[in-house]
């Protein structure tokens, strides 16, 4: 992570690259990255009531004990008043009592992040709000003015699901696998003109061929243990699942769900007998 909380990776201590580019390089699209690491919820604008309709989700109340006004979409009754203290347990009780769809104000969307790209005009630079865009009054107004009434929002909060990877995706200029692999090639071989075929071959040779990369059986066992993976210790190259698990672990570390390994602990080092 850097000071802006973007997630990066490095190869051979060279220039850092967005972690989202690594995920694209192994075949993920930006949509698939968002789906892998974040749940999402749909919001639809009700023009008659001037409110946004969505499913009631108790998870949204883990990070706060107060709330904006919430209206039962079915009955029209106010179930949570503005400023009421609502705990996660209280929210779960609302759900168990039958609260399903709710209406919320536009302000309740402020600070949330788009789970899918939204195109509001043909302007390639200003007319597209990418995955991870943080919503505010101006952006929501532009979306509605473009006659877009339904959007998908990533579920994030300040307690256990930060928007770090969403921010990384938003700032990543690469859009697909070829873009990502080409950038990685340029970092590894600066000054050499890249072609897609050569860049792909170099990237695959880095980690995914046994002739060039070997975790060793000990490395595989340690990786399986640290990342809770089930993989034969005979597989000593990196797999896509390993990279995905590493990114999940990095997000967990940033969210305080895990602890960083102690580099000085011998359990985290390869110890060989001498003599």
Predicted segments with their positions:
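N-terminal non-catalytic structural scaffold regions of very large proteins
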Residues: 1-275
């Amino acid at each position: 992570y850097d000071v802006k909380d973007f997630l990066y990776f490095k190869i051979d201590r060279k220039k850092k690259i967005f972690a989202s580019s690594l995920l694209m390089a192994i075949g993920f699209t930006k949509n698939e990255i968002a789906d892998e690491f974040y749940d999402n919820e749909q919001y639809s604008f009700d023009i008659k009531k001037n409110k946004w309709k969505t499913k009631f989700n108790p998870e949204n109340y883990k990070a706060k004990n107060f709330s904006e006004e919430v209206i039962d979409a079915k009955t029209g009754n106010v179930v949570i008043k503005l400023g009421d203290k609502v705990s996660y347990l209280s929210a779960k009780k609302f759900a168990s009592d039958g609260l399903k769809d709710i209406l919320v104000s536009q302000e309740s969307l402020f600070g949330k992040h788009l789970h899918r790209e939204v195109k509001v005009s043909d302007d390639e630079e200003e007319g597209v709000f990418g995955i991870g865009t943080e919503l505010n009054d101006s952006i929501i107004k532009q979306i509605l003015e473009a006659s877009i009434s339904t959007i998908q929002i990533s579920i994030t909060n300040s307690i256990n699901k930060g928007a770090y990877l969403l921010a990384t995706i938003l700032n990543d200029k690469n859009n697909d696998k070829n873009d990502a692999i080409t950038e990685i090639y340029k970092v590894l071989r600066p000054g050499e003109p890249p072609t897609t075929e050569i860049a792909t071959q170099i990237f695959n040779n880095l980690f995914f061929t046994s002739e060039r990369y070997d975790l060793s059986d000990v490395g595989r066992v340690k990786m399986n243990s640290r990342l809770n993976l089930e993989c034969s210790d005979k597989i000593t190259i990196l797999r896509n699942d390993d990279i995905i698990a590493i990114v999940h672990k990095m997000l967990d570390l940033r969210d305080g769900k895990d602890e960083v390994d102690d580099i000085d602990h011998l359990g985290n080092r390869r110890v060989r007998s001498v003599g």
